């Protein structure tokens, strides 16, 4: 099963400094049919204006993965962590028993990012934060695991979830196959370009919910960049 979610149909919020598209119910956007996909609870497509951002605010019991598409983001939290991540970088914040943090675009141009919230495998984990650079040349033509709750993914940022976050950059004409397995769920979003999954064409910003399929075949119709979360049984 492939469920297409066009960019134009996503939830939308205009805060002036923040333009946000919501793949799932979030804040004032609510759709009873769009609560989660597997363990994916939130997927926000954000554009943050220069010298603006999110002030200190709390989170609890959620694995929050930030994928920078353009620009950069500066993070600070109640654990004493400070960091700046830019395009090609990934940040993971495990909220666990509770964390307070801020995120600002301190740059001269817009920052574009995906922020993905994944439900943890249990509540009460110790909060933590980490980031890592994943040069796009390292995942050209193939999926690279960016964050994962599985011990075999030793190069990925760790999360406390039955899930993995994958990224790939594709040249026009590239085809990659991924063994999803029927009992697992996938949620894929196009960060750049145009791709086809079987007979489903996705453009920049579009998404596909994947379920009950053994293997997915992805073809790049032009140079493309994609992000996918694979999770266990639907929660």
Swiss-Prot record:
Q: Which reaction does it catalyse?
A: quercetin + O2 = 2-(3,4-dihydroxybenzoyloxy)-4,6-dihydroxybenzoate + CO
Q: Which InterPro entries match?
A: Pirin, Pirin_N_dom, Quercetinase_C, RmlC-like_jellyroll, RmlC_Cupin_sf
State how the cofactor is bound.
Answer: Binds 1 divalent metal cation.
Q: What cofactor(s) does the depicted protein rely on?
A: a divalent metal cation
Q: Which SUPFAM superfamilies match?
A: RmlC-like cupins
Q: What class of enzyme is it?
A: oxidoreductase
Q: Per UniProt, what is one GO molecular function of this protein?
A: metal ion binding
Report keywords, A-Z: Dioxygenase, Metal-binding, Oxidoreductase
Locate the residues binding a divalent metal cation.
Answer: 57, 59, 101, 103
Which E.C. number(s) belong to this protein? 1.13.11.24
Q: Name one Pfam family in it.
A: Pirin
Pathway it belongs to? Answer: Flavonoid metabolism; quercetin degradation
Family of the protein in this entry? Belongs to the pirin family.
What's its job?
Putative quercetin 2,3-dioxygenase.
Q: This protein is called what?
A: Putative quercetin 2,3-dioxygenase ZMO1337
Please give the organism.
Zymomonas mobilis subsp. mobilis (strain ATCC 31821 / ZM4 / CP4)
């Amino acid at each position: 099963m492939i469920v297409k979610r066009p960019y134009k149909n996503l939830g939308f919020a205009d805060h002036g400094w923040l333009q946000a598209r919501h793949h799932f119910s979030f804040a004032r956007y609510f759709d009873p049919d769009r609560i989660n996909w597997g363990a994916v609870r939130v997927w926000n497509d954000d554009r943050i204006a220069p010298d603006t951002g999110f002030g200190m605010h709390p989170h609890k019991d959620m694995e929050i993965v930030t994928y920078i598409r353009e620009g950069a983001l500066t993070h600070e939290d109640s654990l004493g962590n400070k960091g700046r991540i830019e395009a090609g970088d990934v940040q993971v914040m495990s909220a666990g028993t509770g964390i307070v943090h801020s995120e600002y675009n301190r740059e001269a141009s817009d920052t574009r990012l995906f922020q993905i919230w994944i439900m943890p495998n249990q509540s009460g984990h110790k909060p933590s934060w980490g980031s890592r650079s994943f040069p796009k040349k390292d995942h050209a033509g193939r999926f690279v695991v960016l964050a994962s709750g599985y011990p075999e993914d030793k190069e990925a940022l760790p999360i406390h979830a039955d899930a993995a976050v994958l990224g790939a950059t594709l040249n026009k004409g590239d085809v990659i196959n991924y063994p999803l397995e029927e009992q697992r769920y996938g949620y894929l979003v196009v960060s750049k370009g145009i791709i086809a999954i079987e007979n489903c064409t996705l453009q920049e910003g579009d998404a596909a919910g994947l379920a009950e399929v053994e293997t997915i075949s992805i073809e790049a119709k032009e140079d493309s960049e994609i992000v996918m979360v694979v999770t266990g049984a639907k929660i």
